[in-house]
């Protein structure tokens, strides 16, 4: 009896350690969104990101940062998205203090950092924080052959009707292996993330990439016709788990790392 108890205890400890390791190995993401009204604002933010912010993040040990643009004609504004991957939340916490001590960053970004109140470089800036999905714990660089200017990056945001149903949609990606379907069909996803802080919650986001618009259309056609997708989407346990799908087709800034 004692040996059986010790064996079961050991199994439970190992399971706990494994679970902790899996959670600890998941990356943490920040998406900064700049809301712009004028071309002057866009130029100031572009210059800041290209000449100061991205180089400073590189010095801080973040090798690849994605910068993407969205022309929101319906909202009469332009958006610049900055995707920053961190190995952990602790590393994210250390970034701002590091930037404050980076004299080169302060010098290179002076025009943006010291902007006057009546010459602000943006209308609004928001920050979205995400935990990587367990089914795809690390971000991936897209394997594309076309120039950055031709590529289409598709950012999707799935809001859930309730927290419970939102978790069900996340489970559909992980345990239901919707992520595996995307991989099999070569959607070149950069990340899948669960929003832990942002203006839209409960929410998940993911970014897929394509050679061009025709390539995107062909991929989604194959997705909709795939036998596994038809099976997965028809499962009773995965019904009514999404309230709103916000899809945005982004272009890549010429100074983006990918």
Model-predicted segments: where are they?
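Bacterial Sec-dependent N-terminal signal peptides
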Residues: 1-25
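Short S/T/G/P-rich N-terminal loop/turn motif that feeds into the first structured element of a domain
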Residues: 20-106, 111-229, 239-258
């Amino acid at each position: 009896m004692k040996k059986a108890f010790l064996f079961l205890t050991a199994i439970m400890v190992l399971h706990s350690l494994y679970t902790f390791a899996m959670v600890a190995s998941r990356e943490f993401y920040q998406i900064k969104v700049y809301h712009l009204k004028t071309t002057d604002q866009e130029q100031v933010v572009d210059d800041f990101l290209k000449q100061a912010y991205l180089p400073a993040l590189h010095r801080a040990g973040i090798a690849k940062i994605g910068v993407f643009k969205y022309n929101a004609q319906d909202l009469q504004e332009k958006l610049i998205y900055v995707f920053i991957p961190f190995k952990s939340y602790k590393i994210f916490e250390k970034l701002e203090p590091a930037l404050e001590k980076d004299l080169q960053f302060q010098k290179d970004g002076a025009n943006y950092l010291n902007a006057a109140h009546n010459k602000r470089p943006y209308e609004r800036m928001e920050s979205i924080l995400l935990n990587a999905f367990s089914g795809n714990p690390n971000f991936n660089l897209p394997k594309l052959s076309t120039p950055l200017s031709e590529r289409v990056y598709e950012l999707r945001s799935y809001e859930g009707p309730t927290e419970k149903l939102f978790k069900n949609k996340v489970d559909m990606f992980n345990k239901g292996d919707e992520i595996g379907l995307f991989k099999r069909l070569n959607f070149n996803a950069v990340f899948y993330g669960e929003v832990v802080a942002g203006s839209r919650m409960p929410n998940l986001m993911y970014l897929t990439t394509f050679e061009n618009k025709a390539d995107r259309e062909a991929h989604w056609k194959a997705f909709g016709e795939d036998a596994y997708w038809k099976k997965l989407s028809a499962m009773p346990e995965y019904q009514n788990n999404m309230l709103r799908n916000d899809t945005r087709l982004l272009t890549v800034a010429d100074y983006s790392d990918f």
